[in-house]
């Protein structure tokens, strides 16, 4: 085993995760239609502080993320500070690591805690797939800039005359990778074919995710970590995630047509995570600061790792790459884990990563390691369901998974939990959590 990297301050304090909260997650263009990510972020951070009863001035830093950027609020973190009654002097900045954004936010706050520059901070993320930055064509954008600099009406009219009707059409946000032009679903199809993952296996995982998420809600396991969202103009509320299909059957999944490779594909809307709106956040402190304030943490951040691979083929293998590093830095093995929670971007991606974590060939030939990371025990894996069921507001998913895993670890009497995700650009993230 490689070098263990303890996540402690210079005084030996562990990094405590005090509490976490999220909004319910809503499918695109449903309950949160028209509510921008910055407002979802304010909603969850305001409620998190109110529930924790921690004075706002205790929080010295807020690191927040947003993947679908809105030009009018480029620093979502600072807008949340200013919009929630937090101390105006609270440091705040924004991060983006695609689907691992709130993992990055947590890591950044943890690094500030270890450096000794703060003793308490908030990390999280929010995204809206319903409020999108609809742009204009490159030609229209260029003409508008030139028109702004034109001095006479004739110059302006001449510039506008260059435009055609197609140049006036709105341009939605890109759904493909900038570098390759591939959509995430195209990559999921690649992975299904590369690793021999069948449609039946994908549908079974998706069905499992929905069944377990529905059961988690019915048993009341998520009530403490999901707020009730009152939706402007405050005539409606949302108390639970609205994507979960607890009454579906495997036969229902089989009816859907492939969404990306129409002829030969196996990836469908049902075995993929949907576009979703929502926000999530966690409070982190040094262990000594929690004792000063009389707080009992949910748990502790034991280690983390971020990785990057090539984007042209099977790029959603982040968990298979980042997990062995995070375990190594924590001084643990897969056998030591009580729970494993992997972001389910697609069932195909999830199953491919599970396969490679247990592969000796992948470990030796690709990672340069002597042994496989370890088989994933189904009884420990995504026990409360995953992103296919809950939904995936890109920047919020990491904070959801962290909070959910720590609560479940505490229900089980403590232990270690692995949380991990793939992300666009061939990125990967993994963290090891500890609860007592």
From Swiss-Prot:
Pfam families: Thiolase_C, Thiolase_N. This is 3-ketoacyl-CoA thiolase. It is an enzyme of class 2 (transferase). One of its GO terms (cellular component) is cytosol. Keywords: Acyltransferase, Cytoplasm, Fatty acid metabolism, Lipid degradation, Lipid metabolism, Transferase. It catalyses: an acyl-CoA + acetyl-CoA = a 3-oxoacyl-CoA + CoA. GO terms for molecular function: acetyl-CoA C-acyltransferase activity. Catalyzes the final step of fatty acid oxidation in which acetyl-CoA is released and the CoA ester of a fatty acid two carbons shorter is formed. Its EC number is 2.3.1.16. It is found in: Cytoplasm. It comes from Shigella dysenteriae serotype 1 (strain Sd197).
